[in-house]
Amino acid sequence: MAKKITGYIKLQIPAGKANPSPPVGPALGQHGVNIMEFCKAFNAETQSLEAGMPIPVVITVYSDRSFTFVKKTPPAAFLLKKAAGIKSGSGKPNTQKVGKVTRKQLEEIVAMKKADLTAADIEAGVRTIAGSARAMGLTVEE
């Protein structure tokens, strides 16, 4: 018989830096999950990634207090900022541009995020990510 699911927890944790302090500890503690066990498992799975890269994770908690988790790809905004070499997006994206990204960079981001994007093909994914880039005040170069 399958285990009964008691809840889902969605968090965004820096790669290799999960620790019991907020926001991780309280979120897991509410559901009775062993916090250190999750932190060790998450850090082990993300040690190959760039340290500090935010990784969205969905934790499924079962009635016997066990858990499984699924890692997602880093947010598009983080990848765009990294590609453009900027610290943050523009406060006024329509008037104040803060950087540039090329189509090749967008294609690399789409290739990385392919599993989490709903786009039908690479071209649609590029358009989606290009829209995110423009919303952040980045200029998209063809």
UniProtKB/Swiss-Prot annotation:
Domain of life: Bacteria
Record's GO cellular component terms: cytosolic large ribosomal subunit
Gene3D superfamilies: Ribosomal protein L11, C-terminal domain, Ribosomal protein L11/L12, N-terminal domain
GO molecular function: large ribosomal subunit rRNA binding; structural constituent of ribosome
Key words of the record: Methylation, Ribonucleoprotein, Ribosomal protein, RNA-binding, rRNA-binding
Function: Forms part of the ribosomal stalk which helps the ribosome interact with GTP-bound translation factors.
Oligomeric and partner information: Part of the ribosomal stalk of the 50S ribosomal subunit. Interacts with L10 and the large rRNA to form the base of the stalk. L10 forms an elongated spine to which L12 dimers bind in a sequential fashion forming a multimeric L10(L12)X complex.
Listed name of the protein: Large ribosomal subunit protein uL11
